[in-house]
Structures are given as C-alpha cells and as structure tokens.
Amino acid sequence: MGDTYPRRRDYDYIREKTEQTFYNRDVATKELVDEIYATVNSRKAIQIISLAKSTIRHNVEKDLHKLTLPCCIVWGRNDTITPPEVADSFHRLLPQSELHWIDECGHVPMLERPEQFNPIIDSFLQKIKM
C-alpha cells in the first residue's frame, strides 16, 4: 500500500487496498481494515509509507546475488501486488534459496494461509539449524 499516503484518511480506499492484498477478500475483515486504517493514520505512518515507497523505487534484484545465506521464499500464487514471476526471478538469483508456492493466496501468505505458511517456515528453520 505504498501509494496510499495521499488517500490514507479515506477509509473506503484503505478497505479496497486491503481487500486487494488477499486472494480471499473475506480475510480483510472489518477489524483488520480498522487496524490498518489506524496504522496508516498514526504518527509513524509517514515513516512506514516512506519505507514502502523506497522499496518500490529500489530494484532489489541487482543485489540478490550478494546474499549467501539460505533463503526461504514463500509466495502466494495469486499475488496481484507482486506477481509470481518475481518469485521465480528471485529464486533464480538467490543461490541458496528454496521457493514454496501457496495456492489461492495473495500478497500476504502469513496472514491469509498461516496453516500452510507456518509449517514451511518451521521446516526451513529446522533444515538450517546449526
């Protein structure tokens, strides 16, 4: 939601953006939308939104080859914010990465499909345990 700063006080706009984040729009409950609305309208919102906008401007792909640690990429197959092709590209560029897809899932698999996301992360952490 990096582009929401000018309209952050527009509740309907925040609700719409929140719904677009998920494959299953029912995940964007009123409680979640209320929480996000409060967050983007807090004093720290400008810093958060500024950080989000900086990620849009910075192309991380050119730096990924520098990462030498194991990486776990978990991607919603129905992500409309950052398309699945980006996950494939990141996976190719990260030498020690594994890529996991979650079907019927949008941009935030940890919120939309925690029952699938958490075991993937647990398994990855067990593998890299030193």
PLM feature segments, named:
Residues 8-69:
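Conserved alpha/beta-hydrolase catalytic His-Asp/Glu region
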Residues 80-86:
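Conserved alpha/beta-hydrolase "acid-adjacent" motif
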Residues 96-130:
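Catalytic active-site module of serine/aspartate enzymes centered on a nucleophile-bearing elbow/loop
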Residues 62, 85, 112-115:
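Generic recognition of short, well-ordered alpha-helical segments
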